[in-house]
């Protein structure tokens, strides 16, 4: 394969130009700065001869404004606090006694959850986590509010969301948004709060106030396309909205995508497949609203023509010297690692399955390859899941000085290698044989966590039966891609539906429902420690998810027998 390396002297000034421009823009979707950023991006692309356009997508946005915590009997006690996107809007405040859930991060049985619900009802709960599923339980238990204590020592407060809905909600989804206020405080203030609670005989009364702006706005979604010889294309994406200036999350990703657009426009005569690049709005305050809108509005086109989705989120971060790859599992590991080895001299630190996040909105779209580069420091000192592990993630401190241009250039070159292979080579780097085995292993691990009543043996047998047919198809596809590759693509896409989704192609799982075979994950509980009501619901979910899985596997089997 002919590979033309990106040229530093040509592309780095363009990337840096965008970084400097974005470093003074607060790009929360729906804001003037965000719309200005989208226009600036399109104008930059056009100035380099690219035909960029702005799509328009309506999104439901939840913008955190203020959050506060006061203690009724300790008027001098103060702390900094932030509310969370899609928290309840309670500007008048809510008051109740504080209750510390010391085991909030531990697993509980159904009966333990029932007892817990009685303890938290009517309380403002203090906890060491604030994930969406926990907030949902608090809401159902009629807790009054949540104070989330951040678990690592940085004093900066991180913006986050408690929205359980992936993308824009439907009418039924809307009922799931929290009805209680949620705030976060840092670890230092959290320990002060717990000390006050510990050394006070009577329950400590508190008041939470939150202000949020929940509204609908039409947001810009920049897109550029570079045509190839066929109508197939690779989708490269990054979210351009941010919390505050968000230079590493995600102006660096936006700049990398601009560089790839310029580079591959210059190689367009060589491209077998096209390159489509999208910059999403609504990642932050619409819970992946932009990418979900795109999946909804281009579903057929994605299913028929898109061969890969590469998401770019937070490259080029200070101290993030180690490369990690998050991938669907259908990608050849040698393909993924080759680009990293060529640029860094060694393979990725690890390749792990994609989790819930990162605008992974395309599991029901029929796309076979999904992966993303991630990077981590040698020594992690923060519980920050983004910005290369940097403590500044989702804070006002995510500024230009947190960028390492050398690391950004490294990441740019890795993406150029990946894209060159995908855009030029006739065979896609699909390893369906290895992916099938990974799914079998994940199913075995899941079975060990389930009650024996929830047997997955029928699904396991169907997966075993597919081993030889898929190996044969993969051999044919690599030998004669023009004839057989489309069948391999559809087969892998159905395996993705099995592993990464629990619903149909036209709906989305909740934002917190992850793990392999997500429809079965909630069944990982001891039936002997559940109420009859919960047991019946679990049995019903098991039956429906089994039927869905077996139908998908039968569809694959029928296709391979033709």
Located regions from the model:
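Acidic/histidine-rich catalytic neighborhood of metal-dependent amide-processing enzymes
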Residues: 242-328, 429
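C-terminal non-catalytic alpha-helical accessory regions
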Residues: 413-417, 422-562
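Extracellular/luminal Protease-associated
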Residues: 79-175, 179-181, 347-348
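Noncatalytic luminal/extracellular "stalk/propeptide" segments of secretory-pathway proteins
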Residues: 2, 8-13, 20-121
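Acidic, glycine-rich active-site loops and adjacent beta-strand->loop/helix elements
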Residues: 152-153, 212-214, 240-243, 278-286, ...
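Soluble metallo-hydrolase cores and metallopeptidase-like ectodomains found primarily
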Residues: 85-111, 169-248, 259-274, 296
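Second-shell loop/turn segments in exported
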Residues: 2-9, 23-32, 100, 122-129, ...
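Active-site-adjacent substrate-binding region
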Residues: 318-437, 494-512, 516
């Amino acid at each position: 394969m002919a590979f033309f390396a990106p040229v530093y002297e040509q592309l780095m000034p363009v990337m840096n130009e965008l970084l400097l421009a974005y470093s003074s823009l607060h790009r929360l979707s729906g804001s003037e700065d965000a719309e200005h950023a989208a226009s600036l991006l399109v104008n930059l692309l056009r100035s380099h001869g690219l035909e960029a356009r702005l799509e328009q997508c309506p999104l439901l946005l939840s913008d955190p404004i203020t959050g506060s915590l006061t203690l009724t009997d300790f008027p001098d006690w103060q702390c900094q606090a932030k509310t969370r996107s899609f928290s309840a809007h309670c500007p008048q405040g809510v008051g109740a006694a504080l209750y510390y859930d010391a085991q909030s991060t531990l697993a509980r049985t159904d009966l333990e959850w029932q007892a817990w619900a009685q303890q938290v009802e009517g309380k403002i709960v203090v906890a060491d986590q604030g994930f969406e599923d926990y907030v949902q339980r608090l809401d159902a238990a009629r807790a009054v509010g949540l104070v989330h204590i951040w678990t690592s020592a940085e004093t900066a407060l991180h913006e986050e969301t408690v929205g359980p809905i992936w993308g824009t909600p439907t009418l039924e989804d809307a009922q799931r948004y929290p009805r209680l206020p949620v705030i976060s405080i840092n670890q230092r203030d959290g320990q002060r709060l717990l000390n006050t609670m510990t050394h006070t005989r009577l329950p400590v009364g508190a008041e939470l106030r939150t202000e949020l702006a929940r509204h609908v706005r039409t947001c810009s979604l920049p897109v550029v396309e570079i045509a190839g010889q066929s109508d197939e294309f690779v989708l490269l994406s990054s979210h351009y909205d941010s919390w505050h200036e968000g230079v590493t999350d995600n102006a660096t990703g936006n700049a990398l995508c601009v560089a790839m657009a310029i580079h591959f426009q210059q190689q367009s005569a060589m491209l077998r497949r096209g390159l489509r690049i999208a910059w999403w709005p609504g990642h932050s305050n619409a819970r992946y609203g932009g990418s979900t809108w795109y999946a909804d509005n281009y579903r057929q086109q994605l299913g028929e023509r898109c061969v890969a989705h590469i998401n770019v989120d937070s490259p080029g971060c200070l101290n993030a010297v180690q490369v990690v790859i998050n991938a669907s599992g259908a990608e050849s590991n040698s393909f993924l690692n080759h680009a990293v080895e060529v640029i860094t001299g060694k393979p990725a630190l690890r390749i792990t399955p994609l989790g819930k996040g990162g605008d992974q909105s395309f599991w029901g779209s029929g796309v076979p390859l999904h992966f993303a580069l991630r990077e981590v420091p040698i020594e992690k000192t923060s519980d920050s899941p983004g910005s290369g592990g940097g403590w500044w993630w989702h804070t006002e401190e995510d500024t230009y000085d947190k960028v390492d241009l050398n690391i950004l250039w490294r990441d740019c070159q890795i993406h150029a290698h990946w894209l060159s292979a995908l855009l030029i080579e006739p065979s896609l780097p699909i390893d369906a044989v290895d992916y099938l085995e990974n799914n079998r292993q994940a199913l075995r691990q899941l079975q060990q966590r389930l009650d024996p009543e929830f047997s997955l043996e029928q699904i396991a047998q169907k997966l075993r039966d597919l081993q030889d047919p898929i190996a044969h198809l993969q051999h044919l596809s690599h030998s004669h891609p023009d004839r057989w590759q489309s069948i391999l693509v559809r087969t892998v896409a159905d395996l993705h539906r099995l592993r990464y989704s629990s619903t149909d192609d036209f709906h989305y799982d909740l934002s917190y429902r992850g793990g392999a075979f997500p429809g079965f994950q909630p069944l990982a509980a001891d039936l002997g420690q559940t109420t009859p009501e919960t047991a019946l619901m679990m049995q019903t979910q098991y039956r429906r998810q089994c039927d869905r899985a077996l139908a998908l596997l039968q569809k694959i089997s029928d296709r391979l027998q033709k």
